[in-house]
Amino acid sequence: MIRFGPYVTPWGGIGAGPLGDGVVPREIALQSIRNIGIMAHIDAGKTTTTERILYYTGQVHRPGDVDDGATQMDYMEQERERGITIMSAATTCSWRDHRINIIDTPGHVDFTSEVERSLRVLDGAVAVFCGVGGVEPQSETVWKQADRYGVPRVAFINKMDRLGADFGRAVQSMVERLGAKPIPVTLPIGAEDGFRGVIDLLAMKAQIYHEEDLGATFDLVPVPDDLIAESEAARVALMEAVAEVDEELMELYLGEDGVTPEQLRAGIRRATLAGNLVPVFCGSSLKNKGVQNLLDGIVDFLPAPLDRPPIVGRILIDGVPGDETAIRQPDDEEPFSALAFKILADPFAGRLAFMRVYSGTLAAGKVVLNVSTGKRERIQRLLRMHADKREDLQEARTGDIVAVVGFKEIRTGDTLTAEAHPLVLDEMTFAEPVIYMAIEPRTKADQDKLGAALQAMADEDPAFQVRKDPDSGQTVIWGMGELHLEIVVDRMQREYKVACNVGRPQVAYRETVGKTVTAHGEFEKDLAGKTNFARVGLVIAPGEYGSGTTFVNEVAPGALPPEFAGHVEAAVRQACDTGVLAGYPLVDLAVRLTEAKWVEGESTEMGFRNAASGALWDGAKAADPVLLEPVMTVEVTVPPDFLGDVTGHLNSRRGRVIGMQQRGTDQVIHAEVPLVEMFGYATQLRSLSQGRGVFSMLLARYEPVPEKVAREITRLYAGA
């Protein structure tokens, strides 16, 4: 029998002196640190899994329950009321003498930016899938995000106790929908109501959990007779899968002595770190089964900071990032470097900046350089966070994820370094908002607070934007979906005590061009007795989808001063903020500056800006402008009795049904629907399915609006 040990807090001072005083031995070896994220589709059981991890590692005395609104990680009122994760939350725990820094990320598509910035600074991830649903739409999104950052993963097939749970089907969905190479390292004993434990394929033992202590202890017993053949076949498949991608294990597998569990474990680790395989565990977090195996997998298979490539940054030349790069190894002896990946307004500690330390050490009270702003900042406090609780630290070291108090000016994505060794890390990028609505204060007192509250939330959330409508003067807030903006407004009223009125949500359309044109702009005007003159020629062409606006200066060297070329580019980009059909941003344009005329003493920045913006707008009008709308990938799950009504309703909303499949006793409809047609869909689906249907959606792409719909949108804009 394996028994969970006594409660031991993972906190503790690092016990090191300030920068420059010499590096003392680490409390936790760098090889024993795991920086991981927990990621999943909404309702896969991600937060419940995190709560069980905290319980089994001794971080909490009793696991929190999502349904009761009593979880450690979902501490916002809005999270507890809705039973979902809205903001990523950080915590730390210990397992087998390893420190595990965990970031629990949201599963709802509206909060994908939280996942994006977390994956940027993490070394590994746990992907949680529902044993019934398998891979779902948001699962695909976060998986692609992890692919982009090259983050090694393990998977946990959760909810094996639920009706319709099927481990094999869930694993197969990873192959079909993610293109992954999953390798089960545990198998379920039973399913649905009969799920009672797991088989460890490395040890070839069964684990039967004890209900009286919430699964903290379990019996190790021989594999049940009826599962021996399946388990042996699965272990052979596991060894063969690893041997195919790991030469060292292949030699052992073909040798006479066979493969020991330790050798197999080492081979799985190498294959996981290389991104060739994904170890898969199974269990039920709610029913306290299988989570300890997952913890073992985090320690055994996910990378330490030493296992990840060193960071590369650009060296500053006269304060500007140049083409020359520098490498920072994950080592306490290297110059300090870190990335600020999250800003949070804490009611007790003030403004917090979460950072990942990539190299060197940093002591409280010391000064760092914010390379992104060029400003020196003194660190007042260093904190290790446990959701909304905090523990003071004397020092942060390589591999640590900590919160910092003391920055006067900092943004998500800023690079922090030692003053004497500056370099700039790549900035973080986020998807553009797809929805917006007007907001106004109810009273004069609210008006004074509105701007500060909106700015504070925009600082926290890079996917949330605040803009002024240039025509009406209204304040407009932009976000990733209805729920995103609903949460913003709710926080305004609860946290910032600002009463406000909001308009109806509107779709964030975009504009582009359909053909290549040449356009000219000229500005010649006498202002205050001085002539202002500039003339430019632009070639405007359709660009690659998702490319934004690209600008190339093709004017002969020396024919135009560089500062004027810079003003032209800045004006072109600014002009693209307002389109020519309905005032929506112009995107995916390839702009070339091919002509320019200037006169010494008469040409100015203002002149070139006006000439360039005029040329851009005139050219866009002549280039067959096109209105674009966001189209969503929609997945609707309903009982078979309602399939016809729901499908017909989707078709009536300009939806395209692209496939159907059976999932347990339900039918799953895969469709693509314009976002504007999905407003209020949750209410209508409840009516169509007698409350038994559920749906999820995520952005697929932008595509041209049908001509009839586009005419109505432009008519409303012209009459505004």
Residue ranges and their predicted role:
Residues 2-720:
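Structural and coupling elements of P-loop NTPases
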